[in-house]
């Protein structure tokens, strides 16, 4: 007998609750002790894709759909009147709405608390105008605590012509093709203890909406974002206990609010929206919202309760609103920036280091942020300068966490770039560590215990602007970690600085050489196109080069090669532009060869220094 079968029935029922109902029912063939066990499940998860998968086109066959209906009916019949906690139904294969409503009513009568419905009906499936309607029993349930509704089309989620009362509902999530809501105040009043609301693809029926709820703490509204649909001219939000707001839609003309508590909304444009959320504790702003907030930099409210601020940026949007935000967050502790690169303008503000200013870093100096997380770091020069800027002007910064962009071509030598930043920034650097937080266990990596111990040893201290920096690199890496902190001398840091500078200069030089060569090639192509004789000479040279490759390296130049070189020299002398281009191109190739040779010698010297240390007395 296997060990699982010897477990108590309560434990085995709990294990089955994590499986789809169809898979749980299949365990009845294992033994007699499993025969009826699945019938006592309090969590039912029924998914028609599990039942009809994997044969393509199977869902179109009437007998298969009928067998699915019989399966669900059989499961519910076997359980009888036993209590049920959670019922999840995914049904998008053309099942008639009457069957779906019968199943919903069954679990409602048995006291279901969590109900998740993912349904989709065609026009042929629904006989009523306005699409599928949920059973009336669902709107008067006294046991529902969580309700999640999702559909693609032809579903009318709410009955406006009947009364509704769900006294224990705390979480409501509706994601539909279109949600036509009107009389929002009446809608929310049906849920006296509602705490979380999420609505996606929402279209407003009324031009003036009021959302009032004393219990609501989390509100997410995602409109259609299509101008052709109706959008409210005014949204009034009366939610004194609201802690989280996610609003994504075209901006309404007005956002009045009647509440006199913690949140006060009194605005007639976008400025009012930001004023109305000034008492929140966590705020995340997308790149679009960040750009819109440039309109209210001068009237930015003070966020006295804000602890966490997240900003998403891209290269096409500016940072005009960032300085005002940072100056008006007197208790900010955690700052998240997703994407350091942004559009550089003269109104960019002093939060970045893009333009030299006399009042550089003023908004950062007044910001008390303790932890900074940078996401999507690519290792570019601009990003490196931004990191330097933050380290220099955030006075209370204790911890910086950098998430490097995976597999980005510009993300090179990120650990050494951070070494350069920290070393150049401060006159005194006691210890600076760059750690690799590996996404998977790899040879040579640090364990979690080692990371925790090292972090404990390197407690940041800022009183005398002496920093112990600890950077987390959230990326897979096979790089051998740096030595322990007690072995990291100033000489080691200086060596890492020099190596990083050398590699950075080499990359800049290679980029300049590549650009110069591309321009010279373009110039030569233009000259060749305008001079047929030169084109013939170049073709002859290509043929000669091909013959040279076939010949041995010690063979002397043939008479044909000497004649060609003489002809080419004559053509070059007659065309000064071509002569200059050829000389520059040859100089470029020579310089590249010299650089490559110097690099090889440097690497050889490092290798010999590692494996053959100097003897005593040398």
Swiss-Prot record:
Repeat positions for LRR: 147-176, 196-223, 224-249, 282-313, 314-339, 354-379
Domain of life: Eukaryota
SUPFAM superfamilies hit by this protein: F-box domain (SSF81383), RNI-like (SSF52047)
Chain intervals with Polar residues compositional bias: 595-609
UniProt cross-references to Gene3D superfamilies, sorted A to Z: Ribonuclease Inhibitor (3.80.10.10)
Presence of the UniProt keyword Repeat in the record: yes
Keywords in alphabetical order: Leucine-rich repeat, Repeat
Keyword 4Fe-4S attached: no
InterPro entries, sorted: F-box-like_dom_sf (IPR036047), F-box_AtFBL13-like (IPR053781), F-box_dom (IPR001810), FBD (IPR006566), FBL60-like (IPR055294), LRR_dom_sf (IPR032675), LRR_FXL15/At3g58940/PEG3-like (IPR055411)
Pfam families documented for this protein: F-box, LRR_At5g56370
Sequence ranges assigned to domain F-box in this UniProt record: 1-47
CDD domains tied to this protein: F-box_AtFBL13-like
Region described as Disordered: spans on this chain: 587-618
Name of the molecule in the record: F-box/LRR-repeat protein At3g58940
């Amino acid at each position: 007998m296997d060990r699982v079968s010897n477990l108590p029935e309560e434990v085995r029922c709990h294990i089955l609750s994590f499986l789809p109902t169809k898979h749980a029912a299949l365990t009845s063939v294992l033994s007699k002790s499993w025969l009826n066990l699945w019938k006592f499940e309090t969590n039912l998860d029924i998914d028609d894709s599990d039942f009809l998968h994997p044969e393509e086109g199977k869902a179109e066959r009437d007998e298969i759909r009928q067998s699915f209906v019989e399966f669900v009916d059989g499961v519910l019949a076997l359980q009888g009147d036993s209590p049920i906690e959670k019922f999840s139904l995914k049904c998008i294969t053309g099942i008639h709405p009457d069957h779906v409503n019968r199943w919903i009513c069954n679990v409602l009568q048995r006291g279901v608390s969590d109900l998740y419905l993912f349904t989709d009906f065609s026009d042929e499936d629904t006989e009523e105008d306005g699409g599928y309607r949920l059973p009336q029993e669902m709107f008067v349930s006294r046991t529902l605590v969580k309700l999640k509704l999702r559909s693609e089309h032809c579903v009318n989620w709410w009955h406006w012509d009947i009364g509704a009362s769900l006294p224990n509902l705390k979480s409501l999530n509706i994601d539909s093709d279109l949600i036509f809501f009107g009389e929002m105040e009446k809608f929310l009043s049906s849920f006296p203890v509602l705490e979380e609301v999420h609505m996606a693809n929402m279209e407003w029926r009324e031009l003036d909406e009021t959302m009032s709820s004393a219990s609501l703490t989390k509100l997410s509204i995602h409109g259609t974002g299509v101008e052709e649909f109706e959008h409210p001219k005014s949204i009034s939000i009366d939610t004194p206990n609201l802690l989280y707001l996610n609003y994504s839609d075209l901006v309404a003309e007005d956002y009045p609010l009647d509440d006199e508590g913690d949140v006060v909304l009194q605005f007639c444009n976008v400025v009012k929206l930001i004023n109305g959320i000034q008492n929140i504790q966590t705020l995340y702003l997308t790149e679009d919202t960040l750009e819109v907030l440039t309109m209210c930099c001068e009237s930015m409210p003070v966020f006295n309760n804000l602890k966490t601020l997240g900003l998403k940026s891209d290269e096409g949007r500016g940072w005009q609103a960032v300085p005002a935000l940072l100056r008006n967050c007197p208790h900010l502790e955690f700052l998240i920036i997703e994407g350091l690169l942004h559009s550089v303008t003269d109104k960019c503000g002093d939060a970045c280091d893009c333009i030299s200013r006399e009042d550089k870093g003023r908004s950062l100096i007044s910001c008390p942020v303790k932890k900074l997380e940078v996401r999507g770091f690519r290792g570019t020069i601009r990003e490196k300068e931004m990191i330097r800027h933050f380290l220099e002007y955030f006075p209370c910064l204790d911890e910086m966490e950098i998430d490097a962009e995976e597999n980005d071509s510009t993300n090179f030598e990120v650990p050494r770039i951070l070494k350069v930043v920290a070393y150049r920034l401060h006159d005194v650097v006691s210890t600076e560590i760059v750690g690799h937080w590996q996404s998977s266990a790899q040879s040579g990596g640090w364990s979690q215990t080692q990371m925790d111990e090292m972090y404990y040893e390197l407690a940041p201290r800022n009183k005398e602007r002496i920093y112990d920096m600890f950077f987390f690199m959230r990326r897979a890496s096979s790089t051998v970690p740096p030595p322990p902190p007690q072995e990291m001398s100033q000489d080691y840091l200086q060596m890492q600085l020099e190596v990083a500078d050398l590699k950075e200069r080499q990359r800049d030089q290679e980029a300049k050489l590549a650009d110069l060569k591309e321009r010279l090639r373009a110039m030569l192509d233009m000259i060749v196109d305008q001079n047929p004789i030169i084109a013939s000479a170049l073709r002859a040279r290509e043929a000669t080069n091909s013959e040279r490759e076939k010949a041995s390296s010690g063979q002397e130049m043939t008479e044909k090669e000497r004649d060609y070189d003489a002809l080419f020299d004559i053509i070059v002398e007659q065309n000064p532009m071509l002569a200059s281009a050829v000389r520059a191109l040859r100089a470029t190739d020579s310089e590249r060869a010299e650089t490559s040779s110097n690099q090889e010698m440097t690497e050889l010297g490092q290798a010999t220094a590692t494996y053959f240390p100097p003897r005593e007395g040398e």
